[in-house]
């Protein structure tokens, strides 16, 4: 059994050793909740990695969106190359849940596009938890949605070893039962093929490696792993576990039992609808449910089988669904990253799901058991936590109330200080800001401006563009890929000024930013709360020459608290630097930037120099193209699609220029 072991040239510095010791001691003392209050750029991820290494517990890291989850996953893979680090997020590229709008009598069918690569990673995560303890899973809030019963999942897992007495047809039957399909032509993930005495399987948790079971009569002679693309043998296996192709797979016995319960619930519900004189709804429900029952009986599943998950699990009405949290051992450790954002997100999930399901049940599209295919309520989520570390620069009341220990991490390894904050009057703020922008850009730095409304962001962008400032705006209407493109352009200097609303809070750690301007800072509200202001101020904490300007006529409570907190941290940081003779230095290229797209900008910046280096060393262009193509495939494999696209463009340019 592997142990967590960090591979890094860095050692904990600054506040990190004290924070690590404090939190590890608290966890070992059996405390349920603790908080890591770490400022931007203080190396919170490295602290988390050290806590995992010291406590040796299976770990779940909860992030508030897919992008940050992917970034954290990549960082932890670097820290723990010899351990299992998995990525668990929603596998939908596009998802339209089924819904009914009574006002217009409109039923919207469920429509979804599933990302096969992410589905594979989800299976890889759950199967890893069944096999090992040295497992870290980085997940989005998707992990609080129903996932199927882990006990049934374990029970249906097929365990095979050389020398076992197993009939080939018996193994095939079991594979079909756990929703694998036979396909001798299009051999893909979740399928198997038969070639003489050999049975080839591509497990649900892999797409590049297959398992070959070689039979001799009724005995398993040998088990080998092979490359799906080339067919080359990779190695011998002494044991293999084939996990179900679906998290909602169930045994024949469970399905038969479930069908009887579904039929009973249908009968009860039809009586209720008929008594209420809802003849159309009763007819609709009968037709739809009987069709689902027939599909389950014949195929072992039906479209929307998750709506019957409570019955398949054998749970009572109203009980919480089984989720990824139930796949972890009882002593697992959880980190909630950016907890001030993630926890409210977890809290909001249940209500939205319930209101949509109510219409579906009332109007005969679903049985009441559909209510129990849902995310966890917040109280249920709390009850499933064993031990948790809340991680945030601005922890909320909940985190502080539920923590026995709060460990502060204020010192940055780079010696960088929290920025200087200036307060200037609102009158003439735009003209004053224009002067500051010019001075900042002339020094080769960038500017972030936060406004209160989308309209103001757009108007200010237009105004600055008319003054020949390279400005652009970013708000909620801009999709993720466009957002990444804008950040890349900002880092490259194609854009000097980025204007936004609250999108400028978490996840925009850009070292080139030397000025953050907060317009209308005294308009108290959620965009100008203490938490929002501290997070926004933090965007200027990656550059040694940065400052923050708040435009305000009054000093609100939130402003006062955020300014005092920033000043408190700044004093601690300056004293530490003086004591240890540290000069603050701008991080030009951190361990890894939070937004994945920023890595692409570094690729583009280095592109010309790479080509020049290659020319000096007499490396042929063909060789360089080959190298970039390998990197592109690796990036796509690691879900770094923006980086892969950038490399693709570089390859295209190289090919055109070499003609």
Curated annotation (Swiss-Prot):
Motif annotated as Beta-hairpin, chain positions: 91-114
Annotated ranges, domain Helicase C-terminal: 429-582
Compartments where found: Cytoplasm
Gene Ontology CC annotation, any one: cytoplasm
GO molecular function: ATP binding; ATP hydrolysis activity; DNA binding; excinuclease ABC activity
Gene3D superfamilies for the chain: P-loop containing nucleotide triphosphate hydrolases, UVR domain
GO biological process: nucleotide-excision repair; SOS response
InterPro entries per the UniProt record, alphabetical: Helicase/UvrB_N, Helicase_ATP-bd, Helicase_C-like, P-loop_NTPase, UVR_dom, UVR_dom_sf, UvrB, UvrB_inter
Every Helicase ATP-binding domain range: 25-412
PROSITE patterns, sorted: HELICASE_ATP_BIND_1, HELICASE_CTER, UVR
Domain UVR, first and last residues per copy: 622-657
Binding site for ATP: 38-45
Keywords: ATP-binding, Cytoplasm, DNA damage, DNA excision, DNA repair, Excision nuclease, Nucleotide-binding, SOS response
NCBIfam families per the UniProt record, alphabetical: PRK05298.1, uvrb
Family, per entry: Belongs to the UvrB family.
Domain notes: The beta-hairpin motif is involved in DNA binding.
Job description of the protein: The UvrABC repair system catalyzes the recognition and processing of DNA lesions. A damage recognition complex composed of 2 UvrA and 2 UvrB subunits scans DNA for abnormalities. Upon binding of the UvrA(2)B(2) complex to a putative damaged site, the DNA wraps around one UvrB monomer. DNA wrap is dependent on ATP binding by UvrB and probably causes local melting of the DNA helix, facilitating insertion of UvrB beta-hairpin between the DNA strands. Then UvrB probes one DNA strand for the presence of a lesion.
Record text on subunit structure and interactions: Forms a heterotetramer with UvrA during the search for lesions. Interacts with UvrC in an incision complex.
HAMAP family: UvrB
Protein name: UvrABC system protein B
